[in-house]
């Protein structure tokens, strides 16, 4: 993200590979807030297969346009409701947030690589120089 110092507005490219990878990876759940200018994706509450009284919500915040581990933050919230529909919500620390983050980074790298390969001006640095 670029910071425009005059306005305090952050510029985030929606064509960014991490943004696109996140949207693709979160397509299994409804999204409640997708703000590309603010660099955030928030899912709606959704229930895991085996639990009707527990729901989770995923937040993905983009801190950079670059494909880097410190350029993205994934947070997961869990809501548990009792039989009287009283609910408690808390942020959870689990391996799931790290797994989602890694999946986004891997998918973003794959997207970037495929775009480079299809770019006619791209020269593969691994290719041997045949000029003598």
Briefly describe each language-model feature range:
Residues 1-132:
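Ser/Thr-rich, low-complexity intrinsically disordered terminal regions
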